[in-house]
Amino acid sequence: MFYIPDSYLSSLIQEDLQFMDLTVMALGIENVPAKLSCFPKTDCTLAGVEEAARVLRLAGAEANVLLKSGTDAAGGSVCLQAEGSAGAIHGVYKLAQNIMEYSSAIATRTKALVTSAQAANPNTRVAVTRKNFPGTKALSLKAALAGGAGIHRLGLSDSILVFDQHRVMTDDFLTQIAQMKKDFPEKQIAAEAENAAEGLAYIAAGVDSLQCERVSPAELAQFVKEAKGINPQVTVLAAGGINSDNAAAYATAGADVLVTSWVYFGKPQDIKMSFSRG
């Protein structure tokens, strides 16, 4: 289960439907029976369908999910249907559409990246960062999971990842690695290196995961060879500019994990909302 509370979805409804739908009220159609069918116009990996259904239910309509999040849907395949008053459906249909369009786009981009990476190296995994647009973390992460990715970091509180901006505040990071492992025995210690020599030194000092930022696939391949020579169990992550076009190259280079924010940004999927009288 991926938990998204009703309170979050209700807050999204309230952003658009403050009190009433004035157009529906002016037309006098609030109580006219209505039906809604939703489908992607082109092939995609669906996401956000369950949340769209919940939004419709919160407004008082009945909603039925026909194709779940994570489904590779053909264009024109109906994924969600709803029935209820025109007032209920018109009040939230645009929000339901937005949730599915943005979520399905994230899932589709994620699926393309994962497919490319694992075709080149079945052992490589893809993980998404916390660099989603503020306020969209739950929907963004659920969509990325639907596309086959894992989660790099939920936030600052679930993992230890040391960047250069942390190290400039310390006297000697290398000497702190062993102490950090003692102080947090249930947590892996991860660090991002500025260059190969720095990364190898961190691995020799005991970090569990080493993140390589914006290195070429050729540079990464050489680094992986040297890193695994020091510690065969170390996890090497490639980050910075990872997308579906270069995922295969970085996977072939031997990255254990491809860390990406790319999936969050791009054109929404086109989801058609088809109305009829009930």
Please describe what each predicted stretch is.
Residues 213, 231-236, 278:
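Short, structured secondary-structure boundary patches
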Residues 216, 227-228, 243, 249-251:
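Catalytic-pocket segment enriched in acidic/His residues
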Residues 2-194, 198-205, 209, 221, ...:
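Acidic/glycine-rich phosphate/pyrophosphate-binding loops and surrounding catalytic core
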Residues 242, 248-257, 276-278:
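Ligand-binding grooves and catalytic loops that recognize ribose/phosphate and carbohydrate rings
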Residues 262-278:
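Short, charged, intrinsically disordered terminal tails
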Residues 214, 240, 261-262:
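Short secondary-structure boundary segments
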